[in-house]
């Protein structure tokens, strides 16, 4: 049964790998046998992730990449293939958020969220997908959100970008699955990451959030690793075009 989840011999690119969910997924993949291409803008934190992965006796290539640049995305893919020989898994975890009422959202803020959460994610899929299509195999895991399923006030740009990610995932699955490339998404509920410390440490915000969350707590980043390993492994071989809810019951209401 353990072989179903084994990632030995696989090479995984993980974006947003310096901290939070991306960091935990990169390290989690390495513990199940994968070599990692860890991608982020924060080079200092990225080198810490590289060091931890190498303690698992796995290879780790740390790449500082601005995902707002398609040229840098393509360079990421080329470097990964040159250094690692192939790409088996792409986990698109990088993302941003702007907390603001819809009537106050600026064009720059809207574009910032859409450019990272949707545009750059698509071009990562395209760039790495070309390699996977030539190989005849690959797994792509996109980061959606429960807010993209049911919406959430004050998160207009974020929620709409994540809804688009789920539909993009379906569309890519329709195009690529018959060619050996499965494409799925994960939609977490509220996850307490460093980027959300300022929100979740606010008692008023946190207590209000708990009234909407059946499990009555936020997730730890490590709790998203298991679903990611499932989607990266043979355990999910017949699964494609799906968005896997890992939301503490958020969307059950």
Model-identified regions with their sequence ranges:
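Residue(s) in the substrate-gating loop at a strand-loop-helix junction
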Residues: 145
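C-terminal substrate-recognition "lid" of short-chain dehydrogenase/reductases
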Residues: 84, 137, 217-246, 251-252
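Active-site loop-to-helix junction immediately N-terminal to the catalytic Tyr of the SDR YXXXK motif
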Residues: 2, 105, 151-159, 171, ...
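Alpha-helical segment proximal to the catalytic Tyr-Lys
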Residues: 130, 174-178, 237
